[in-house]
UniProtKB/Swiss-Prot annotation:
UniProt name for this protein: Large ribosomal subunit protein bL31B
GO biological process: translation
Gene3D superfamilies: Ribosomal protein L31 (4.10.830.30)
Chain segments carrying region Disordered: 70-89
Gene: rpmE2
Length: 89
């Protein structure tokens, strides 16, 4: 590897503010914020809008999309068009 062209790979804390959840991992992300972690060391901090702790897919709080209304509207339009074409021909 060439020297001086690769970003620093270091421990970083990612915090999901919405879920009040943080985890320590390694990353090359750049940030000016820091946080004191549970082990007493200070690490760079990256604030997240969403993570597996708050995403509906991972938490099981998914919103079910009601497609029944769409299907019913489509079927009613189809029936009307069939009736119109049946009356004409």
């Amino acid at each position: 590897m060439k020297k001086g062209i690769h970003p620093e790979y270091r421990p970083v804390v990612f915090r999901d503010a919405g879920a009040d959840f943080a985890f320590l991992t390694r990353s090359t992300v750049e940030t000016n914020k820091t946080i004191e972690w549970e082990d007493g060391n200070t690490y760079p901090l990256v604030e997240l809008d969403i993570s597996s702790a708050s995403h509906p897919f991972y938490t099981g709080r998914q919103r079910i999309v009601d497609t029944g209304g769409r299907v019913q509207r489509f079927e009613s339009r189809r029936r009307r068009r069939q009736q119109q074409s049946g009356e004409q021909g």
